[in-house]
Amino acid sequence: MLIILITIILGLFISLITLPLGYYAPEWMLLIVIYWAIALPSNSKLFLAFLTGIIVDIVYGQVLGISSLFYVLLVYIILRLYNSLRYMTIAQQAVVLFIFIFLKQHLLVWAYYIIDRNIDYQALLVGSIVTASIWPLIYYTLRFIRRKFNIGGIN
């Protein structure tokens, strides 16, 4: 669990580095949480998604709880589709993640519209594409870390 938390913290630092890109920046934290939900499925990943979402809200200055709601919702869906996602190719997973992330971004726009905050919809679409396109990088990096530290009992 310590390695998982370290990867979340590293994802936070990478998110801070890409913060000036705004909505064009990839969602590093979400991808890391999704990877751990696919690699080691358990209900504790829902709590991890909630905490990560709260951290993202604080860092980005968003409405507190909105990211955690969407993170928990996405991780729940990932856990329900675990058997299907686990055996997909990386490209297929990236397409599925694009759809999930785009829906999350769309719901975020809707939630911000309710509280009278305008968001550039095109930037969210590009951000979803960028996020899905870096999935292979996140997947292979975290898989290497998982195997190196023998997390989950796999060599």
Residue ranges of predicted features:
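Terminal, non-globular segments
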Residues: 1-155
